[in-house]
Design a protein with these regions (language model features):
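Short, membrane-interfacial amphipathic segments enriched in basic
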Residues: 1-6
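Hydrophobic alpha-helical transmembrane segments of multi-pass inner-membrane transport and secretion
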Residues: 16-43, 251-287, 310-319, 363-367
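Hydrophobic, regular-secondary-structure patches
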Residues: 27, 31-117, 136-138, 143, ...
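Mechanotransmission and gating elements of multispan inner-membrane complexes involved in transport
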Residues: 86-89, 95, 106-113, 139, ...
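Short beta-strand boundary microenvironments
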Residues: 114-156
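Transmembrane alpha-helical interface segments in multi-pass membrane proteins
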Residues: 278, 283-332, 356-368, 372
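Short juxtamembrane loops and helix-capping segments at transmembrane helix boundaries
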Residues: 328-355
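Short cytosolic juxtamembrane segments of multi-pass membrane proteins
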Residues: 374-388
Length: 388
């Protein structure tokens, strides 16, 4: 015979203030836990969606990032003429020789400057990225000092809106379009003509070469040929994998810092739940004795108090997840430690994060309620009935 759930529920409802405060304490911990997971997922999604599995990025061997990479002009010519590279409808190869440069720009809401990544792209650069769309203005003309800005750059930095001008590399550059890259890393970049940018920054070499495969299954052959060619000191990776690796350092930092904070805060929430449950046991000693006298076993009492603790944890989980869900409406920016430029991304809540956060809340409830539940189950019947 088990203790009815209605009994447990009425006990929580009878102590509204204590129940609410305990649940809110757990909710704050769940909020921190879920927000960290959402932040990590947002960063991962932003970086992974920057790359396409059909594209290959070729950089200098062991460079790690495009910023550190150098690809000679003759090497780039060899790479883009590999047989696995696809052709466009105009008969030209779908390859883009690109250069990466960092500049400092002032933000719109303050005069503080931050690094922004400038990407020089070839004529096929935007065709290789189907997720990129020009939402305002137009594409820049090849051979000109026109540029297009990612929507996050246009919103956050002075001079990055359509019709405005930016001055860098001793030239005036006119912003002629805004691109929406589907919440990928390209939203935090400025694009221009690769040849003009290389001349302006006096760079004789490219940073990378982007290729589209005519068949994704031919990647191993392309990779082997490029990396074994003695004329080249380059390595080839699928673009999606390359950008996913770029997010690892920052994602790991966010994860470990968030987990440490969650553990510290959860200790406080568990202690709070434990105090609440101990007080509940002390105040209901007579009730517990009556239940035992009516035939309920120690295991039934233990289960009833654990269910009560689980209900507290569930309430905290629901409140915390509800609070965390509103973070999806915010976009934050941080330094990408791989490229040393600012990267903007959003919080993303998915089913996996919901389940992990709710499970975390239930675990806090069980841990906080276990010892008080054991105490309740071990109370002597006669002593309990004498309690007033």
């Amino acid at each position: 015979m088990s203790v009815p759930l209605s009994y447990t529920w009425r006990n929580l409802a009878a102590r509204k203030l204590t129940t609410l405060l305990t649940a809110c304490g757990m909710a704050l911990v769940v909020f921190v836990f879920a927000t960290v997971l959402m932040l990590e997922e947002g960063l991962r999604k932003t970086m992974v969606e920057t790359g396409s599995p059909d594209n290959v990025i070729v950089t200098r061997r062991s460079a790690g990032t495009e910023v550190q990479s150098l690809v000679e002009r003759d090497q780039a010519a060899i790479v883009e003429n590999q047989p696995e590279v696809a052709y466009g409808i105009d008969g030209a190869r779908l390859a883009s020789k690109e250069t990466i440069v960092l500049i400092a720009l002032p933000k719109r809401d303050s005069n503080k400057t931050s690094n922004v990544l400038i990407r020089g792209v070839g004529q096929k650069g935007i065709e290789l990225r189907p997720q990129v769309e020009i939402t305002e203005g137009r594409m820049f003309h090849p051979g000109s000092t026109e540029i297009i800005a990612g929507k996050n750059i246009a919103e956050r930095y002075k001079g990055a809106g359509v019709g405005e001008t930016l001055r860098f590399a001793q030239r005036e550059w006119t912003v002629v379009g805004i691109m929406d890259a589907g919440k990928s890393g390209f939203d935090s970049e400025i694009w221009g003509d690769v040849d003009q940018l290389m001349q302006a920054f006096r760079r004789p070499v490219y940073s990378s070469v982007i290729l589209k495969l005519n068949d994704a299954a031919t990647f191993p052959q392309l990779k082997s040929r490029i990396e074994e060619d003695p004329r080249l000191t380059l390595e080839a990776k699928r673009e999606s994998i390359f950008y996913a690796e770029q997010s690892q350092v920052l994602a790991n930092f966010i994860r470990y810092l968030g987990m440490m904070l969650s553990i510290i805060f959860s200790a406080g929430a568990i202690i709070g739940a434990m105090i609440t449950m101990y007080a509940s046991v002390a105040n209901r000693a007579t009730e517990i004795g009556t239940l035992r006298a009516l035939g309920f076993r120690r295991g039934n009492i233990l289960t009833a108090f654990l269910v009560e603790a689980l209900m507290l944890g569930a309430a905290g989980g629901i409140i915390g997840l509800t609070m965390a869900s509103f973070m999806q409406f915010f976009t934050i920016s941080t330094m990408n430690w791989q490229s040393f430029s600012e990267l903007a991304f959003s919080f993303i809540l998915n089913l996996e994060i919901i389940l992990k956060s709710f499970a975390f809340a239930l675990i806090m409830g069980v841990v906080g309620g276990f010892l008080p539940a054991v105490r309740a189950a071990r109370l002597n019947i006669v002593d309990s009935l004498r309690a007033v």
